[in-house]
A protein has these predicted regions:
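Switch/communication elements of ASCE P-loop NTPase nucleotide-binding domains
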Residues: 1-105
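Acidic, Mg2+-coordinating catalytic modules of nucleic-acid enzymes
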Residues: 95-227
Length: 227
């Protein structure tokens, strides 16, 4: 906490200095969020963002507070992974974070690529992307787009049954793709028709499915533009 207080104070003082009086510091911090309360992490991030306006700041982090900040979307993000086949055992990658969304990498996307961790946030982002690409931005239209893509990709899929009551109170059983059923389970947690643990058990598979479909749709679009 002492280090946090010093950084906050330092950021406040140096942000008021004129350009000519500032020295060219570079800040290197290795997981500065360790042992900090989430609110403390948020304050630390604010201080580092203030400092980064005037000096270069390089931070290694696993903090969801840091990664969830919209400010991260404009940062220069690097992914460091261990690879025993290289001399240094470390591979640094940047391009992967720029592959999906125009507004920059999201927290869910970073967790997926950096930690191999599927999240409901990333699933929602991918499904929303498919809804935007479909004819009417509805679940039904997105599900139709998924099924059409499966046929074009020659991929077999087993439909899931989503049970619900319609507007007249009658029971309905809809055949939907896995991704649509997970989307519905996330948005309607009171509906237990898929059983306990359905989302957790199938989240990773569904994300992989949608990533393949999005890749297919983009390749199809590029081919049409090239004609």
């Amino acid at each position: 906490m002492t280090a946090l207080a010093l950084l906050v104070a330092w950021a406040s003082v140096h942000s008021n200095k004129t350009v000519g009086t500032r020295k060219p510091y570079i800040f290197l911090l290795d997981e500065p969020e360790i042992c900090l309360h989430p609110r403390g992490q948020a304050r630390l991030l604010d201080a580092l963002l203030t400092i980064s306006k005037f000096y270069q700041v390089i931070v290694t982090t696993h903090s969801p507070i840091f990664l969830h900040s919209p400010a991260v979307r404009t940062a220069n993000l690097l992914l460091c992974q261990r690879d025993n086949s290289t001399a240094s055992n470390v591979v640094v990658s940047q391009a992967r974070f720029r592959s999906l969304f125009l507004h920059g990498p999201t927290w869910g996307e970073i967790c997926w690529h950096a930690y191999n961790m599927p999240t409901v946030e990333f699933h929602d982002e991918l499904y929303s992307y498919l809804q935007d690409r479909s004819s009417s931005a509805t679940v039904e239209a997105a599900d139709k787009l998924l099924r059409l893509s499966f046929d074009e990709m020659n991929e077999h899929h087993t439909p899931c049954i989503w049970s619900r009551k319609d507007n007249k109170g009658k029971n309905r059983r809809d055949k939907l793709t896995l991704s649509s059923c997970i989307r519905n389970s996330i948005h309607h947690p009171d509906n237990k028709c898929m059983g306990e643990g359905f989302v957790e058990k199938n989240l990773e598979e569904s994300i992989n499915i949608m990533l393949r479909v999005i890749k297919h749709l983009r390749a199809k679009e590029e081919a049409q533009l090239a004609e």
